[in-house]
UniProtKB/Swiss-Prot annotation:
GO biological process, one term: DNA damage response
Keywords: Cytoplasm, Transport
Main location: cytoplasm
Role played: Part of the ABC transporter complex MlaFEDB, which is involved in a phospholipid transport pathway that maintains lipid asymmetry in the outer membrane by retrograde trafficking of phospholipids from the outer membrane to the inner membrane. MlaB plays critical roles in both the assembly and activity of the complex. May act by modulating MlaF structure and stability.
GO cellular component: cytosol; membrane; phospholipid-translocating ATPase complex
Organism: Escherichia coli (strain K12)
Cellular compartment(s): Cytoplasm
Gene designation: mlaB
Protein's name in the database: Intermembrane phospholipid transport system binding protein MlaB
PANTHER family xrefs: BLR2341 PROTEIN (PTHR35849), INTERMEMBRANE PHOSPHOLIPID TRANSPORT SYSTEM BINDING PROTEIN MLAB (PTHR35849:SF1)
Length: 97
């Protein structure tokens, strides 16, 4: 069973906690535009697992923030996230470092 996903915006940082798993993404997906408003950093240090659905949502959050005029960095990213992106042949710069 998947752990829940929670998020909190503190200043310009969106901190995610739990699993970025397809089974628990819907609440964040529904709040995505509000969740990224004004953010320049997405903190994944409390994320325990990311699947392909979670990676897709993460990429979408980054894109939404960029469309709002913000450059986004990632913090606390597990190397497995970058490996997953590489396995799907995503461009190296799709996930900011």
């Amino acid at each position: 069973m998947s752990e829940s996903l929670s998020w909190m915006q503190t200043g310009d940082t969106l901190a995610l906690s739990g699993e970025l798993d397809q089974d628990v993404l819907l609440p964040l997906w529904e709040m995505r535009e509000e969740a990224v408003k004004g953010i320049t950093c997405i903190d994944l240090s409390r994320v325990s697992r990311v699947d392909t659905g979670g990676l897709a949502l993460l990429l979408h959050l980054i894109d939404l923030a960029k469309k709002q005029g913000n450059n986004v960095t990632l913090q606390g990213v597990n190397d497995k996230v970058y490996t997953l992106a590489k396995l799907y042949n995503l461009p190296a710069d799709v996930l900011p470092r």
